[in-house]
């Protein structure tokens, strides 16, 4: 579902559209009247509708209950509009909150926006319509100071409870050098430690019943089964989990704030570190979103190279996930086999990009350089090696009766629950929903590849891990097609906003030299607009929503990651289960905390 036009590859590919022809605009107009909202033209590929604050919940409920409903709150966050200069035709706003809704049946999205005055930063909570709004509203309050009236627990989520200020406001410093030196006194240390003490009453929990007390157990933030700096406070009756509270933010780096201080090109290395196992997969949505802003169409060779690198990193990530899941259940050996196989993936990646985990290799309009001589042999060796190894993982470990006994039927949820909590990727497909962005909304030429989308039926831990095995096989299938059908042609687009121009042209045309000088000094200037790109990342759907104000840097960079939604779902799934089941459930989610905390 894109606005890509291919009739003339020399013209800008991404047109600014208002999507007034989208059926949902007619449905909203018939129900609320055309005067009730303002439609914004963007390059996001979806209708963007400003609604009145008083009607927001009514509009969301209406869309939620349509015959083809918008069943998922995909994203929710805010924007500080005070310094934005290109706002012609939009409602007056000091701040805005956006709600990105997704419909599976329509395969369409819509973005609702609400304008807010700095003197009245209040909007009603959406948690009664979409339960996963909880964490998103907490983060939006924390970062912008926007209060969501009626929210069950509006507290900080990324920053320490003692933090002062709202970091994503434009008047909040972006550099550490703009702050006074931090001094940790004994008094401060005591206050910080006190703030980490869990108080059950704050979360509506009881300390016990008439007959016995509950135990409150900290799992993490340094427990090996929490897979990173992640803390879950468990309310236990013996081994049974009565309730739990996930505690995130220990890995927060301010990635979205960094996007406001880096040029469009220099931000690419930061994207690698959002989900540090994904490598080039993380670069894909960012560069595609910037290319929409710039109106760049990349050559077919670039598309295929990007797909090839993305699938190599997908295999690399899935191998680690499968082996650590097996380790969480109690088997050690497969982890060592997996690292042998992952090294073979890295051999190919390093030969092509020059780096391993964080190559920062994709460029706006292309890739850093062409494929090296001999890449075919390296890829061929890996494609000949991996299928048999994958079979051995299944036979030796995943078909083991003990592993199946620990994971079949454990931490199961259905499609309705998955959509309510914003679950994407294998976690959603394990419930029977065949939603894979590579198939449903192809990008970077995925529509030219022949592959299947594995789906499950039970939505349990075992289904989730077996889906990843099948996804590995499909990634190998895609790589085989890259090997056999790599197009000829340039590795970058011939566009003034992309990679440096050919040297011979700079020696003939002074205008080209001036453009090149500006690009490498200040950085490229992107047209004022908004763009959006989602991709099928290693752990679910990852997306970038970019706002340009006609500058060398992004005005607002919103990064939606899959792991954030997946961890928010934990309490609803694990209540009533045992602690041992929680360990298996955490291992089946496939998350890293950099992807959660950004």
Swiss-Prot record:
EC number: 7.1.1.-
Membrane topology reported for the UniProt record: Peripheral membrane protein
Domain of life: Bacteria
Any Pfam family: Complex1_30kDa
One Gene Ontology MF term: quinone binding
Reaction(s) this enzyme catalyzes, per UniProt: a quinone + NADH + 5 H(+)(in) = a quinol + NAD(+) + 4 H(+)(out)
One GO cellular component term noted in the UniProt record for this chain: plasma membrane
Main location: membrane
Region (NADH dehydrogenase I subunit C): 1-189
Gene3D superfamilies, per the entry: Cytochrome-c3 Hydrogenase, chain B (1.10.645.10), NADH:ubiquinone oxidoreductase, 30kDa subunit (3.30.460.80)
Record flagged with keyword Transmembrane helix: no
Keyword Membrane: yes
Start and end residues of each stretch annotated as NADH dehydrogenase I subunit D: 213-598
Subcellular location(s) of the protein: Cell inner membrane
Key words of the record: Cell inner membrane, Cell membrane, Membrane, Multifunctional enzyme, NAD, Quinone, Translocase, Transport, Ubiquinone
UniProt xrefs under NCBIfam families: NuoC_fam, NuoD, PRK06075.1, PRK11742.1
Family note: In the N-terminal section; belongs to the complex I 30 kDa subunit family.
Subunit structure: NDH-1 is composed of 13 different subunits. Subunits NuoB, CD, E, F, and G constitute the peripheral sector of the complex.
PANTHER family from the UniProt entry: NADH-QUINONE OXIDOREDUCTASE SUBUNIT C_D (PTHR11993:SF45), NADH-UBIQUINONE OXIDOREDUCTASE 49 KDA SUBUNIT (PTHR11993)
Function noted in UniProt: NDH-1 shuttles electrons from NADH, via FMN and iron-sulfur (Fe-S) centers, to quinones in the respiratory chain. The immediate electron acceptor for the enzyme in this species is believed to be ubiquinone. Couples the redox reaction to proton translocation (for every two electrons transferred, four hydrogen ions are translocated across the cytoplasmic membrane), and thus conserves the redox energy in a proton gradient.
The protein, known as: NADH-quinone oxidoreductase subunit C/D
Organism of this sequence: Yersinia pestis
């Amino acid at each position: 579902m894109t606005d890509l036009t291919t009739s003339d590859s020399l013209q800008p590919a991404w047109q600014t559209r208002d999507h007034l022809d989208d059926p949902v605009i007619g449905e909203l107009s018939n129900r609320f009247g055309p005067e009730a909202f303002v439609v914004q033209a963007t390059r996001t590929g979806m209708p963007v509708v400003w609604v009145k604050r008083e009607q927001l919940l009514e509009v969301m409920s209406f869309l939620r209950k349509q015959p083809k409903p918008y069943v998922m709150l995909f994203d929710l966050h805010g924007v500080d509009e005070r310094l934005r200069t290109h706002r012609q035709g939009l409602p007056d706003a000091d701040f805005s909150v956006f709600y990105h809704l997704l419909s599976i049946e329509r395969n369409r999205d819509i973005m609702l926006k609400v304008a807010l005055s700095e003197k009245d930063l209040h909007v009603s909570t959406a948690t009664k319509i979409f339960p996963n709004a909880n964490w998103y509203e907490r983060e939006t309050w924390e970062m912008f100071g926007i209060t969501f009236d009626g929210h069950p627990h509006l507290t900080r989520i990324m920053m320490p409870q003692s933090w002062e200020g709202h970091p994503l406001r434009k008047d909040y410093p972006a550099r550490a050098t703009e702050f006074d030196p931090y001094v940790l006194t004994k008094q401060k240390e005591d206050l910080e430690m006190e703030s980490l003490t869990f108080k059950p009453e704050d979360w509506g929990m009881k300390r016990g019943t008439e007959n016995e007390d509950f135990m409150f157990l900290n799992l993490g933030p340094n427990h090996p089964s929490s897979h990173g700096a992640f803390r879950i406070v468990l309310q236990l009756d013996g081994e049974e989990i009565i309730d739990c509270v996930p505690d995130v933010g220990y890995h927060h780096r301010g990635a979205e704030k960094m996007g406001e201080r880096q040029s469009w090109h220099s931000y690419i290395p930061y994207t690698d570190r959002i989900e540090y196992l994904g490598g080039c997969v993380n670069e894909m949505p960012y560069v595609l979103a910037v290319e929409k802003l710039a109106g760049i169409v990349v050559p077919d060779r670039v598309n295929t190279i990007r797909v090839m690198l993305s699938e190599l990193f997908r295999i690399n990530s899935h191998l680690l996930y499968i082996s650590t899941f097996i380790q969480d259940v109690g088997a050690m050996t497969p982890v060592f086999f997996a690292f042998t196989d992952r090294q073979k993936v890295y051999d190919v990646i390093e030969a092509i990009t020059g780096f391993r985990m964080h190559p920062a290799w994709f460029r706006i309009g292309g890739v850093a350089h062409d494929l090296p001589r001999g890449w075919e042999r390296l890829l061929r060796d890996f494609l000949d090696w991996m299928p048999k190894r994958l079979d051995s993982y299944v036979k030796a470990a995943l078909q083991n009766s003990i592993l199946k006994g620990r994971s079949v039927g454990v931490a199961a949820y259905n499609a309705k629950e998955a959509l309510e909590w914003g679950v994407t990727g294998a976690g959603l497909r394990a419930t029977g929903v065949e939603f894979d962005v590579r198939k449903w909304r192809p990008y970077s030429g995925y529509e030219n590849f022949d592959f299947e989308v594995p789906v499950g039926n039970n939505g349990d831990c075992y289904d989730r891990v077996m889906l990843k095995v099948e996804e590995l096989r499909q990634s190998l299938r895609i790589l085989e097609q890259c090997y056999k059908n790599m197009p000829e042609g340039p590795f970058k687009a011939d566009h003034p906003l992309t990679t440096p121009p050919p040297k011979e042209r700079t020696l003939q045309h002074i205008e080209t030299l001036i453009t090149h000088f500006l690009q490498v000094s200040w950085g490229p200037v992107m047209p004022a607009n908004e763009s959006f790109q989602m991709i099928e990342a290693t752990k679910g759907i990852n997306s970038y929503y970019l706002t340009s104000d006609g500058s060398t840097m992004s005005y607002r960079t919103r990064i939606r990651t899959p792991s954030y939604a997946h961890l928010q779902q934990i309490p609803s799934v694990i209540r009533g289960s045992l602690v041992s089941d929680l360990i298996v459930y955490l291992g089946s989610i496939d998350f890293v905390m950099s992807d959660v905390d950004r």
